[in-house]
A protein has these predicted regions:
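Glycine-rich N-terminal segment of FAD-binding domains in flavoprotein oxidoreductases
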Residues: 10-106, 120-125
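C-terminal substrate-binding/cap subdomain adjacent to the FAD-binding core in PCMH-type
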Residues: 118, 137-293, 297-302
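Activity-critical C-terminal alpha-helical subdomain
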Residues: 259-262, 272, 356, 361-416
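Short glycine/threonine-rich loop-to-helix capping motif typified by GTGT followed
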Residues: 228-233, 264, 313-328, 379-391
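A short glycine-rich, hydrophobically flanked beta-strand micro-motif that places a catalytic Asp/Glu
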Residues: 214-220, 271, 299-320, 368-375
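Short secondary-structure capping/junction motifs at helix and strand boundaries
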Residues: 99-107, 147-151, 212-215, 368
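Extended C-terminal subregions enriched in glycine
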Residues: 84, 283-284, 340-353, 359-363, ...
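C-terminal structural cap/anchor segments
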Residues: 281, 287-342
Length: 416
């Protein structure tokens, strides 16, 4: 039970009354219906990688992590249908064996498909293909009444728009049908060193305009600033310093997993991670404020790394209600990853205060946060980010579908 009392953030502890699993404790329909009828708070947990108690409750936790789950190809164009409890690592391995791949993958792959789709999902391929939710063609959602809904851009489109990126507020995503692409055995990769935050941020718009770039991330790891660029097979010109890297996504996952191992498997530190998405003007404003904060306590002690992505969504993309997406042709993601000993309550508190400052700056710059993170929302900030109409709409949807006690901590505890 202890495993389900906290999440990756480890700064909040909420022991659940019980943990249930599909099959062992009934069907998903029965589990959802019984919890709603009893007025019992309920949440879904996949890999538990939220950072601010989003997947915690004192009621019922639905454990959706599924080792050995089986995907299947469906329809045309190599679409794949997957259970939401499968990890991206399992899905990517299954696809690779069949000559296919996911167009957008997170750098760490032991996350469940349902978990990342519930908050949006970014990765190296976002520079060409947008978010992971932009690859979704259909989902199956179970609501609090036990009813199942097939949802897509043209069927139950409101549920589709609120469920993907909505942090569980629109029901339990049971399955998803995803776009896939042909697997590349190896891709050319180049690394570009930067002199600091300002230099890296200035580099981003240029790489966003480069048509031959297939993948991108930028990084500050307390030792160096750099960008890593992968190139498409049809790139007109590949830099001389680029070298072919086989199984690139798997290699990055292994590197990230090794780096994260102490944080994933220990309980001594609070992981105060947060990501923000901004347009080009907002990026410059946000980065300028961040640079000042990085030179002061607590970030001089608690900052682990910064992570940068470029996001170019497909044309006519769906305006998901709560996903970290903007009305801009190119968007930029900045992850600010901090960690402090749980016993050092002062460092934890001061880091949270800095994150609140960054959240306010993100709002002022017209950006949006990524909902898995350690964000200190209030009602005013929620209205600024999402608008009164979307907040009212999700509450009305939750009433209609018997979900008023489901995923109540999607915004970290505050409700609109």
């Amino acid at each position: 039970m202890r495993e389900f009392s906290s999440d990756f953030g480890r700064s909040r502890f909420l022991p659940p009354e019980k943990v249930v699993r599909e099959g062992e404790d009934g069907t998903i329909e029965e589990i959802m219906r019984e919890a709603a009828a009893a007025g019992q708070d309920m949440t879904v947990r996949g890999a538990g990688r939220s950072c601010n108690s989003q997947t915690l409750t004192r009621g019922t936790v639905l454990d959706n992590f599924r080792d050995g789950a089986t995907p299947r190809f469906t329809g045309e164009d190599h679409l794949v249908e997957v259970p939401s409890g499968i990890t991206w690592l399992e899905l990517e391995s299954w696809l690779n064996e069949r000559g296919r791949a996911n167009p957008v993958l997170p750098s760490y792959l032991r996350l469940t498909v349902g978990g990342t789709l519930s908050v949006g999902g970014f990765g190296l391929g976002s520079i060409r293909s947008g978010l992971q939710i932009d690859q979704v063609r259909e989902i199956e959602v179970v609501d609090g009444t036990g009813r199942t809904h097939r949802c897509s851009s043209h069927e139950n489109s409101e549920l589709f728009r609120f469920a993907l990126g909505g942090a569980g507020q629109a029901g339990f995503i049971r399955t998803a049908v995803l776009r896939t692409v042909a697997r590349e055995a190896a891709v050319p990769v180049s690394r570009i060193e930067h002199g600091g935050l300002h230099d890296l941020v200035k580099y981003l718009p240029g790489v966003a305009r480069e048509p031959g770039v297939g993948g991108y991330f930028g990084m500050y790891d307390r030792n160096s600033w750099y960008s890593q660029v992968s190139w498409t097979a049809d790139a007109a010109e590949v830099p001389e310093q680029a070298h072919p890297v086989p199984a690139y996504a798997s290699l990055l996952h292994q590197e990230v997993e090794q780096h994260l191992s102490p944080l994933l498997h220990g309980e001594t530190h609070a992981n105060l991670w947060a990501d923000y998405v901004l347009d080009e003007a907002g990026l410059e404003r946000f980065a300028a404020a961040l640079e000042g904060l990085m030179s002061e306590s607590p970030l001089t002690e608690t900052l682990i790394s910064l992570y940068f992505l470029v996001v170019r969504r497909p044309e006519s993309s769906i305006p998901f209600a709560f996903a970290p997406v903007l009305d801009a042709p190119v968007q930029y993601g900045i992850g600010v990853f901090a960690s402090a000993a749980r016993s050092d309550t002062g460092a934890v508190s001061r880091t949270r205060q800095v994150q609140r400052q960054l959240l306010e700056i993100c709002a002022e710059a017209g950006g949006r946060p990524y909902l898995y993170g350690a964000h200190a929302f209030d009602e005013e900030l929620l209205r600024t980010f999402y608008g009164a109409s979307a907040l009212r709409g999700v509450e009305e949807l939750r009433v209609r579908h018997g979900l008023t006690h489901f995923s109540r901590r999607a915004f970290g505890g505050v409700r609109p």
